[in-house]
A protein has these predicted regions:
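NAD(P)+-binding Rossmann beta1-loop-alpha1 motif at the extreme N-terminus of oxidoreductases
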Residues: 1-53, 61
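Short, hydrophobic beta-strand segments that form beta-sheet elements in well-ordered domains
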Residues: 29-34, 89-91, 127-131
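Hydrophobic/aromatic beta-strand patches that form the interior of the parallel beta-sheet core
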Residues: 30, 52, 90, 112-114, ...
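Short, polar loop motifs at secondary-structure junctions
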Residues: 34-38, 95-97, 131-134
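A short acidic, helix-capping loop that chelates divalent metal ions and anchors anionic groups
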Residues: 39-40, 120-124
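Rossmann-fold NAD(P) dinucleotide-binding segment
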Residues: 51-105
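Internal alpha-helical scaffold of NAD(P)-dependent oxidoreductase catalytic cores
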Residues: 100-110, 125-146
Length: 146
């Protein structure tokens, strides 16, 4: 898995921190430069976390992409991006439905909605995923309950 994040705020920070503190933390991570301070801090803390020059570079270099932007800017951020059919996109945007996200990121075939909580940084708490996806259940299962 080559994991990328579009949006670099508290939730992205929590997921990356939980992932990198797990026993098997070999998943490379590519962050969007959206929040320079958070992105730079994570890249300094973890050697296999890098900051991309822009959001499109995240998409071009990753097969799994988590959307972690605020709902009010999501449509604008996603509008100019070129997604691939083979991307697996995980939307962390609570107020947009899976169907709304799928329409914004066509031609992506695999869209999962996930709702983790910030305590995922400590590998605690539960993450709701919909629809059930074994790969994402295994990923989030390393960070808490699914």
């Amino acid at each position: 898995m080559k994991l990328g994040f579009i949006g670099t705020g508290a939730l992205t920070s929590a997921i990356v921190t939980g992932l990198k503190s797990a026993a098997d933390n070999s998943v490379p991570v590519l962050l969007s430069p959206r929040n320079e301070e958070v992105a730079a801090s994570l890249a300094l803390r973890y050697p296999d976390v890098r900051v991309a020059p822009d959001n499109q570079a995240v998409l071009d270099n990753c097969d799994t992409v988590m959307l972690a932007v605020r709902p009010q800017i999501a449509r604008g951020v996603l509008a100019g991006l070129q997604f691939r059919r083979d991307h697996h996109v995980v939307s962390l945007i609570a107020t947009l439905s899976r169907e709304e996200i799928a329409a914004l990121i066509a031609p992506v075939e695999h869209v999962t909605k996930a709702l983790p909580m910030p305590m995922i940084a400590h590998r605690q708490g539960a993450t709701i995923i919909c629809p059930h996806n074994r790969r994402m259940a295994a990923f989030f299962g390393r960070l808490g309950k699914v």
